[in-house]
């Protein structure tokens, strides 16, 4: 978790809250960023929020950001507000169990900075050993969870 308390609804443009949340989750799980295969993005489809999250992912994961898959399931189910994090956690667990990462629907014209695998339009088969689920909430309360399957 992290709290940047930058603004009621907007993230800090430097993405430090998102970065710290993801970094802390990886540390608690005792894994390196390179272990993550899939990220269920907070991904609300807001230009600022999505760019900030994408920048934080690139900063934390470095080159590995271009090897993992990342999608926003809000594109399929909408923003469930208080329930969003739990439903997105379930999507992450299902990706591990089923070996299928969910798509980012309606991603017809991504910005130029969206140069990683955002799983556009269609689900994708992929072995997922570790998944990271991001939930970046109102007032700068950020949570990221790491999931893995049985050994």
Language-model regions, residue ranges each:
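Conserved "HGTGT" condensation-loop signature of ketosynthase/thiolase-family condensing enzymes
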Residues: 1-151
């Amino acid at each position: 978790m992290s709290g940047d308390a930058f603004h009621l609804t907007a993230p800090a443009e430097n993405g430090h809250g998102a970065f710290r949340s993801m970094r802390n989750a990886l540390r608690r799980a005792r894994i390196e960023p390179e272990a993550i295969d899939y990220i269920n993005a907070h991904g609300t489809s807001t230009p600022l929020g999505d760019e900030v999250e994408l920048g934080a992912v690139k900063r934390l994961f470095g080159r590995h950001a271009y090897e993992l898959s990342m999608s926003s399931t809000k594109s399929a189910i909408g923003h469930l507000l208080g329930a969003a994090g739990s439903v997105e956690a379930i999507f992450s667990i299902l990706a591990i169990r089923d070996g299928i990462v969910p798509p980012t629907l309606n991603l017809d014209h991504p910005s130029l900075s969206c140069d990683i695998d955002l799983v556009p339009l269609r689900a994708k088969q992929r072995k997922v050993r570790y998944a990271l689920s991001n939930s970046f909430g109102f007032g700068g309360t950020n949570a990221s969870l790491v999931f893995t399957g049985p050994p």
